[in-house]
Amino acid sequence: MQVADFDYHLPEERIAKYPPLERGSTRLLVLNRQSGALTHSLYAHLDTFLQAGDLLLLNNTRVVPARLFATRATGATIELMLLERHHHREQLVLYRGQLKAGEMLQSHGHTLLVEEVLPQGLARLALADGGDLHQFFTQFGSVPIPPYLKRNAEAVDRERYQTVFAAHSGSVAAPTASLNMTPELLQRLKNNGVEIAHITLHVGLGTFLPIRTESLEEHVMHRESYLLPAESVAALQRVKADGGRVVAVGTTVTRALEHSAPRILQSSAHAEIEGEADIFIYPGYRFQMVDLLLTNFHAPRSTVLMLTAACAGTDNLRAAYSEAVLQGYNFLSYGDSMLIC
């Protein structure tokens, strides 16, 4: 299967550059993957498409202020993106510009040392005074909004590029499928008998890396660490045993669920599950855990688009995206959403 099979024309005007004026006021395109039928609705009406006994799994990660600008000795400005805290990679950054190992950078009155320059635009940094680099970014950094927005982060992004239930800091990109969740919608879902559970998955480096192969089978997927609490494991086991439906909110949640499926389904224990999801989901994959998927409209040739196609069916998804463009839906992180059921 070729990456080019997942290309399509996305008009620039269909990319939402800012969040909607009111959280939860976006549109929702509902796709029935059995019939291919499409229903035009609103994100705020999600509760009308779910039923008692369903389980909604949300990613409660919190986006950190991971973007920072520094100055080289030459006077050139360089953009730095601090990646997720993860064992020995805790001082890894993604950079845009030129860097050399051993050079010093200046930022907000502090000196940063470039310890090592790595492939794919990565480097290992440290504060020259031995301070905590993550604390430094938290104090001086800005919200790492996606580069395709083609603007700097603004005050509105501090609140709106974050979910209302964000709890555990660590992501450099938001779990965008749930950006339009509101307390009111979550309460209606609970009142209707829909169970709400959480997973913590810190969205990291892979969000910014393009596919560099022509064939899907040759692509090596990035890893994302996750923690599924014991109460969420128990809820998933109970719902599956009772014949209920698991609704994954977002592609990262989907990857983590499918990665942990053997441990969830083959065990009666309710212990927490921790892992690193490196699973690459594309058409032909057989889902074990996820029954419904709530997700955004994704960029051409992206791994998240391929995952969505695996869930919806390639022809169904192609037709749905064509309809969405025609009907003026907004795409990508701050845009509208799809429910695949």
UniProtKB/Swiss-Prot annotation:
Pathway listed: tRNA modification; tRNA-queuosine biosynthesis
Enzyme Commission numbers on file: 2.4.99.17
Enzyme class: transferase
Swiss-Prot/TrEMBL catalytic activity: 7-aminomethyl-7-carbaguanosine(34) in tRNA + S-adenosyl-L-methionine = epoxyqueuosine(34) in tRNA + adenine + L-methionine + 2 H(+)
Record localization: Cytoplasm
Single Gene Ontology BP annotation: tRNA wobble guanine modification
One function term, GO molecular function aspect: S-adenosylmethionine:tRNA ribosyltransferase-isomerase activity
Main localisation: cytoplasm
GO CC terms of this entry: cytoplasm
Subunit annotation: Monomer.
Family according to the record: Belongs to the QueA family.
Record's protein name: S-adenosylmethionine:tRNA ribosyltransferase-isomerase
Species assigned in the record: Chlorobium chlorochromatii (strain CaD3)
Gene: queA
